[in-house]
Amino acid sequence: MTTARRRPKRRGTDARTALRNVPILADIDDEQLERLATTVERRHVPANQWLFHAGEPADSIYIVDSGRFVAVAPEGHVFAEMASGDSIGDLGVIAGAARSAGVRALRDGVVWRIAAETFTDMLEATPLLQSAMLRAMARMLRQSRPAKTARRPRVIGVVSNGDTAAAPMVDAIATSLDSHGRTAVIAPPVETTSAVQEYDELVEAFSETLDRAERSNDWVLVVADRGAGDLWRHYVSAQSDRLVVLVDQRYPPDAVDSLATQRPVHLITCLAEPDPSWWDRLAPVSHHPANSDGFGALARRIAGRSLGLVMAGGGARGLAHFGVYQELTEAGVVIDRFGGTSSGAIASAAFALGMDAGDAIAAAREFIAGSDPLGDYTIPISALTRGGRVDRLVQGFFGNTLIEHLPRGFFSVSADMITGDQIIHRRGSVSGAVRASISIPGLIPPVHNGEQLLVDGGLLNNLPANVMCADTDGEVICVDLRRTFVPSKGFGLLPPIVTPPGLLRRLLTGTDNALPPLQETLLRAFDLAASTANLRELPRVAAIIEPDVSKIGVLNFKQIDAALEAGRMAARAALQAQPDLVR
């Protein structure tokens, strides 16, 4: 819907209407309501401003006319939300106690303030008002529901910073959202908004329109198109739960509204390779190309329906990830976000590049078709291999692509040997992020990154489901490769057909028993050292897929067909058990 500027309503009418809609005042008669309306004070509360803090004297009751407010406990968590028609602070005034919590404006709001003295004087002078309020409060207690602690974004600002018209993009986003719920659009003519001289004029003119649209729709898109004016751009930023910023120039503008950095931001990239300074400036939670796939992925994020796929490390067993992805996508499962560790990072990056399953599998076959990627052995000073083959393979596969330019969400995990910290790669070179995540200590040399010395993330988090689940925009499918260890009986540096006799075995290993090669021992140690958190206890886990890869050697990349089939079978079983994964 499109709206134009509105003149504010007359104050007296507004006060009576606002008071009449308050539950605790529902039963008072018109004369009492009129008397109370003459004493109230109208106040504009800017976005992010505190109405009051915990511990302050309860000196007023506030009636929300427009906007949205949150109650914040002294510990800092939000435990309730208030919108148009709600009263704030009434119990504290009646009890004569200090504020038990703070209240902050989520967006620009208008409240009616009733001074505590005025309210208590009226209660004492009007016994009928006391009875009416007690009845209303009793009803409220009977009908009370637990406060919402988590809430999906509903007001989405769409901002054009350059020459690209926002209207076609908004239409595409709204169309994509239609399959998830009802969407309204507030996009006043730029001639109207650019002519406004005072910010309060916008608050007066559009707050009621925004409140009404929010009450009757699942989402409201508020649009600041090119030429709409700085005041309107600020108003859109202030009202929005999230912002969608259109990127149609290589570098961000010199001036970015301060509120844009205080809201979750999604970028719609209208050119192929915007400069990473956009990410420096706005720290977006996601970015999407300006095409049908990108608009669909953005809509799923807004609706909380964005599916993530997180994959574990496991050497050659990680080839099962490609079979899982093939089975899921061929069944119609749409995945927007990918993440993983070690071999899971390789698969995640391939899928985030936008490859379909067939192309990804073909690329995986090409990846392992040549010489053994771990075959460039050297004197083991920092590692058993030089790492040159791995470097060439990773660089040849992913090139100079930046994570910021991938069409789908991606992260990988490595570990910093200096600090012992988990490093989550969401920015920079895809090749660098993958190479760090697969740097098995002792087998592949670590990666220097500034003051960091990065090794395989499996040392700390072999299946980073907790990282993916921290994103609240949708559910997550986990691919877990942890299985009973079946060691091979080879000697690593020797071909499997060469089995040393007992005497030579004793000379090489000091034992008559057949032991697994060093590479397998290192990889298995990762499985044991990594977190054993119960995946089912994590929020937003939709499914756990567990391919049976126990018979696949962790370094036997020639078993790609067996690994692919194990992945397909496990994904097929998950789909049969949970058909709702297809959305």
Swiss-Prot record:
The PNPLA domain covers: 309-469
Catalytic residues at: 342, 456
**Positions of a nucleoside 3',5'-cyclic phosphate binding:** 24-140
Q: Does the keyword Cell inner membrane apply?
A: no
Q: Which UniProt keywords apply?
A: Hydrolase, Lipid degradation, Lipid metabolism
Motif GXGXXG: positions: 313-318
Example of a GO biological process term: phosphatidylcholine metabolic process
Task: Indicate whether Ligase appears among the record's keywords.
Answer: no
Annotated motif GXSXG, positions: 340-344
Q: Where is this motif: DGA/G?
A: 456-458
Note the InterPro entries from the entry: Acyl_Trfase/lysoPLipase, cNMP-bd_dom, cNMP-bd_dom_sf, LysoPLipase_patatin_CS, NTE, PNPLA_dom, RmlC-like_jellyroll
Per its UniProt record, what Pfam families does this chain match? cNMP_binding, Patatin
Regarding protein family, the annotation reads: Belongs to the NTE family.
- Which named protein is this? Uncharacterized NTE family protein Rv2565
